[in-house]
């Protein structure tokens, strides 16, 4: 029971040994209201948001890197792009990690940001994730798996000692396996698409673990598959596609520092106050995402977006 309740702290990338006990209340939410699956996978949510945005007249520029958020010391004035363009805007919404926003996209001494930068410097980043995407041929025998499956090790506390204290891959990790019975997620009938995730230390060459070693990553993936097969779950004889995603991959693809996909952790009673405000001290700049209020995880990130949208609409109406 303690393992199950401790598990909910990891939903926000936190260490259950020091995270607020209120996170265990997520168990009630799941039991009372259920956990929901989007038909076709969570990517369909992004498709729906994209289409809704197009319908509302939003213009998208993909594969366009923002190199700087421009300002006059008090107010946001726009953004600079990697291709040399400078775009003038009175409102900028930044969904990048707030540490990167305030220290890389906004450089130099900015009096209005002094307190926010100091606060973020004290915040603990979340843990990262090492994941496997598995494409499986049809099984001759029923797997007996649920949509969500969690396999705990004997020593659960050791996992967080490895991640947060020793900053090394977990020797015997808790394994989350998502095995959706959703034909729209696979190309051929009877095939399955599984998502396997274990918690991991951040990618950091100085103060973390180096996830750039392809040989180690493959070995670790095989270790996870071995652990699942030792529990009677057939994988290798059905395996058609294997894609490995490390914290280093997450850092490269989504610009999450160290692959800390939840932004800031909830480690400690005051952790919630260490997150960036949605409304930046720099007028016209808004922060959204896992490292901003109210925290990490898709549901909270959605609330973060709602808060920012309402703040902007409220400002425009006055």
Residue ranges and their predicted role:
Residues 1-56, 63, 253-266:
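Active-site/ligand-binding neighborhood in enzyme catalytic cores
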Residues 3-12, 29, 170-178, 230, ...:
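A glycine-rich dinucleotide-binding beta-alpha-beta segment and adjacent secondary-structure elements
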Residues 17-24, 189-198, 281-283:
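Short coil-to-beta-strand
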Residues 37, 67-188:
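Mid-domain catalytic core of redox enzymes
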Residues 65-71, 313-318:
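Active-site-proximal substrate-binding core of FAD-dependent oxidoreductases
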Residues 93, 134, 196, 228, ...:
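Hydrophobic, well-ordered secondary-structure elements that form the walls
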Residues 137-247, 251:
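C-terminal segments that line or cap access tunnels to active or ligand-binding sites in enzymes
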Residues 290-313:
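A conserved FAD-binding loop/helix module that cradles the flavin
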């Amino acid at each position: 029971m303690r393992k199950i309740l401790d598990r909910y702290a990891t939903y926000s990338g936190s260490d259950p040994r020091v995270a607020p006990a209120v996170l265990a209340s997520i168990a009630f939410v799941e039991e009372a209201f259920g956990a929901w699956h989007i038909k076709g996978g969570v990517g369909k949510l992004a498709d729906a948001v994209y289409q809704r945005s197009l319908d509302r007249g939003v213009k998208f520029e993909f594969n366009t890197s923002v190199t700087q958020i421009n300002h006059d010391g008090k107010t946001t004035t726009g953004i600079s792009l990697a291709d040399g363009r400078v775009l003038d805007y009175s409102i900028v919404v930044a969904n990048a990690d707030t540490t990167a926003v305030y220290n890389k996209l906004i450089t130099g001494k900015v009096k209005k940001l002094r307190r926010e930068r100091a606060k973020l410097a004290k915040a603990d980043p979340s843990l990262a994730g090492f994941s496997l995407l598995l494409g499986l041929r049809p099984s001759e025998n029923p797997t007996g798996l649920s949509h969500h499956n969690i396999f705990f090790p004997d020593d659960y506390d050791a996992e967080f000692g490895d991640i947060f204290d020793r900053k090394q891959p977990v020797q015997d990790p808790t394994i989350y396996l998502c095995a959706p019975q959703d034909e729209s997620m696979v190309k051929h009938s009877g095939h399955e698409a599984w998502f396997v995730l274990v918690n991991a230390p951040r990618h950091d060459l100085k103060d973390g673990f180096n996830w750039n070693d392809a040989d180690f990553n493959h070995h670790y993936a095989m270790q996870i598959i071995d652990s699942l097969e030792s529990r009677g779950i057939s994988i290798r004889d059905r395996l058609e596609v294997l894609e490995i995603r490390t914290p280093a991959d997450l850092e490269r693809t989504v610009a999450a520092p160290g692959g800390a996909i939840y932004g800031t952790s909830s480690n400690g009673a005051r952790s919630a106050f260490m997150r960036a405000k949605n409304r930046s001290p720099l007028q016209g700049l808004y922060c959204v995402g896992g490292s901003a209020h109210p925290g990490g995880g898709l549901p909270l990130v959605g609330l973060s977006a709602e808060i920012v949208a309402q703040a902007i609409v409220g400002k425009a109406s006055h």
